[in-house]
């Protein structure tokens, strides 16, 4: 990567990719981010150095949009302006965990463009000594910092667990997650750190457009394979108890990217929780879920479930249904699960899926503030929605009208002003820190 010669520029220098995937700068042009129909040149002041572990992606079948510093106009480039006839592609950042994007990489689709794979596509540019990302850090914990997950230690942990749990199918499944898919949650189990995943459910009662474990026929493939068996309660509890023994303030989470919804596997999860709690009161037992079955959730709370994280792309029913496409539950069931958890004194998070242009629309932020007043939660876990952003915005605009976005940073500030005790984060906290302010 060449260093930019324009060191005094307020704007980030635009970066593009060649057909071979080589990323380079375009002097004279500034990087642009987009949110809905809004196009914004990226500045140093509103971006961060590219977080460690972030991956850079180039976007096929698309033309980059950038800001011409000479004409002071937003332009769509169909070729390299310095090498006419040379094809160039937009570049996006798939940011590390804990960072949410404020703008999407700006581009225009070509005719008959293929849908983008299931990643988030943050805006990125170059300034002086490195790449910068249009993002905000919402969680500084190093739970999924790849620098703390050396492969030799992961392999050593796998060997130890093979000795400890030789015939445990769930342990075998997590080995595949760690080594085949590079899953940081699975790696943490074998490293004896933080949070252990407990994938259990083979089925789901939603058909999320951006489901990362099961996609129907089409051009998009799922990012990982859904678990193909239901672990026995004994397999679940044995693995969980190992993690509790190895980790101070351990977190155990049902509901992972490689499974359906855990509420549909309550027949094995309930006895597993009972078995864990019969042996120890240590460890935080958490469930990541769509919240579709409040009556089942209540039973799990009664036998030892400590916290719940409910996923939502929107608090507006039409927009929620447009993305989650629920099959056997209502939006009211999701809301009831949140209210139930608070009534029962449990720690409640919303897994709020972020896409600039929608999440920061006045309609969504107004609805979110109203929702939180009526249905309080303890934590918003901000996450980037892994989906083709233009396709997603088209889908959401079919469900509701959306005005000019106000910006993700302003969304965060507005909510914090309205609800000063509400926590922001990315990871499921242990019960020892449930009510510590950040």
Where are these regions (language model features)?
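N-terminal pre-triad scaffold of radical SAM enzymes
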Residues: 181-215, 250-254
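Alpha-helix-loop-beta-strand connector modules within alpha/beta enzyme cores
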Residues: 266-281, 332-346, 400-424
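Conserved strand-turn element in the central/C-terminal portion of the radical SAM core barrel
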Residues: 325-327, 337-364
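Auxiliary Fe-S-binding modules of radical SAM enzymes
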Residues: 1-165, 366-438
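Core AdoMet radical
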Residues: 195, 199, 216-272, 277-296, ...
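Active-site beta-loop-alpha junctions enriched in small/polar residues
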Residues: 257-259, 290-292, 313-315, 353-355, ...
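Short, flexible helix-coil linker/hinge segments at the edges of structured domains or between repeats
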Residues: 152-187, 212-239
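Catalytic cores of alpha/beta
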Residues: 295-302, 357-374
């Amino acid at each position: 990567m060449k260093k930019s010669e324009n060191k005094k520029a307020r704007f980030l220098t635009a970066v593009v990719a060649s057909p071979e995937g080589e990323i380079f700068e375009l002097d004279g042009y500034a990087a642009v981010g987009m949110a809905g129909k809004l196009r914004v040149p990226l500045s140093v002041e509103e971006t961060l150095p590219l977080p460690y572990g972030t991956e850079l992606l180039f976007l096929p079948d698309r033309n980059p949009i950038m800001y011409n510093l000479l004409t002071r106009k937003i332009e769509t480039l169909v070729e390299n302006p310095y090498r006419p006839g040379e094809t160039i592609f937009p570049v996006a950042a798939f940011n590390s965990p804990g960072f949410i994007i404020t703008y999407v990489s700006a581009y225009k689709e070509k005719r008959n463009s293929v849908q983008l794979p299931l990643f988030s596509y943050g805006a990125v540019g170059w300034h002086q000594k490195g790449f910068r990302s249009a993002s905000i850090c919402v969680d500084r914990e190093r739970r999924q910092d790849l620098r703390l997950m050396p492969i030799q230690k992961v392999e050593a942990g796998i060997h130890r667990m093979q000795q400890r749990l030789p015939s445990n199918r769930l342990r075998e499944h997590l080995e595949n997650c760690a080594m085949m898919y590079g899953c940081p949650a699975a790696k943490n189990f074998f490293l004896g750190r933080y949070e252990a995943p407990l994938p259990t459910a083979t089925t789901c009662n939603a058909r999320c457009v951006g489901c990362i474990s099961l996609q129907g026929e089409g051009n998009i493939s799922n990012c990982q394979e859904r678990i193909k068996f239901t672990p026995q309660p004994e397999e679940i509890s044995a693995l969980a108890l190992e993690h509790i023994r190895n980790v101070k303030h351990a977190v155990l989470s049902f509901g992972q990217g490689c499974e359906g919804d855990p509420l549909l596997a309550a027949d094995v999860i309930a006895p597993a929780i009972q078995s864990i709690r019969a042996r120890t009161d240590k460890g935080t037992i958490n469930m990541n879920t769509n919240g579709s079955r409040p009556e089942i959730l209540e039973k799990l709370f009664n036998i030892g479930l400590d916290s719940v994280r409910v996923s939502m792309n929107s608090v507006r029913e039409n927009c929620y249904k447009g993305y989650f496409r629920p099959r056997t539950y209502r939006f009211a069931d999701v809301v009831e699960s949140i209210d139930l958890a608070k009534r029962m004194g449990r720690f409640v998070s919303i897994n709020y899926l972020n896409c600039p242009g929608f999440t920061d629309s006045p309609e969504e932020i107004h609805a979110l503030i109203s929702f939180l007043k009526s249905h309080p939660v303890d934590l918003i876990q901000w996450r980037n929605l892994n989906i083709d952003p233009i396709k997603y915005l088209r889908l959401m605009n079919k469900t509701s009208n959306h005005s000019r976005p106000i910006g993700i940073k302003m969304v965060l500030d507005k909510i914090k002003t309205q609800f000063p005790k509400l926590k922001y984060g990315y990871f499921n906290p242990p019960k020892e820190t449930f009510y510590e302010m950040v």
